[in-house]
Regions:
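Ser/Thr-glycine-rich phosphate-binding loops at phosphate-binding pockets of nucleotides
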Residues: 145, 149-150
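Cys-dependent protein tyrosine phosphatase-like superfamily
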Residues: 1-140, 152-230
Length: 230
């Protein structure tokens, strides 16, 4: 398996492995356990082969149902041993949230994460629970572009296993673009400060427990994601 974080899966444009990052007690995050990216609907045959050879056996979609089907294709894996799971982590029927963020140019920045986390603990916990209970093999988690919803779940996962905020921010910024950076700068902030405020607002393990995860689910995440036999 490659130990390059940036992965070239033909048909996807924003794919990377969350392995190799320093976590609690000097442990490293395990390669091939969690891969984040954009929607796999456009993967070529070669792209699917690369995904499979990387060890992915579960695809976790974080996308929201009820949108136009042509813009929201259902991903069907060409491999029978790859399980596809859907956990919607946003509720587009929440008019107050949609009016505040979806009509704003800040929708594509982490500024909205605090509101999303406060509103939908059960949805975020369900996504992490799906990872904890996934069949053996790696998990590929995605939304449409691999930025926001995928970013939130990656943020929670990496915090849970003790990756530093600096490294989490660096991972987030691999998907950033100059426009979003400028939007933050115009508000006298940056990605690190926004993620710092987001993390300060929650006690993560209690947040997940109150959202419906069990302690065994949380432990399973840590066991899966941490390479402890160093």
């Amino acid at each position: 398996m490659t130990t390059n974080r940036i992965l070239n899966w033909q048909g996807c444009n924003n794919v990377r492995d969350l392995g190799g990052m320093t976590a609690s007690n000097g442990y490293k995050t395990r390669w091939g356990t969690i891969v984040r990216g954009d929607q796999p609907a456009n993967l070529t045959n070669e792209g699917w082969d690369a995904l499979y050879q990387h060890g992915i056996r579960t695809i976790l979609s974080l996308r929201t149902h009820g949108l136009e089907e042509k813009d929201h294709p259902i991903v069907v894996s060409p491999r029978s041993d790859i399980q596809v799971i859907s956990v919607e982590i946003e509720d587009v029927t929440n008019k107050e949230f949609v009016e505040k963020w979806a009509t704003s140019d800040l929708w594509g920045t982490p500024l909205y994460w605090i509101d999303a986390l406060n509103l939908w603990a059960h949805r975020h916990a369900a996504a992490l629970q799906a990872i904890a209970q996934a069949q053996p093999g790696g998990v590929f988690l995605h939304c449409k572009r691999g930025y926001d919803r995928t970013g939130i779940i990656s943020f929670l996962l990496l915090n849970l296993v003790g990756v530093s905020l600096q490294d989490i921010t660096a991972d987030y910024e691999l998907s950033a673009d100059p426009v979003r950076d400028q939007l933050l700068a115009e508000r006298n902030t940056n990605a690190y400060e926004v993620l710092q405020r987001t993390l300060a607002g929650i006690d993560l393990e209690n947040y997940l427990l109150e959202g419906g995860m069990s302690q065994s689910d949380i432990n399973a995440i840590k066991e899966k994601l941490l390479e402890t036999n160093l």
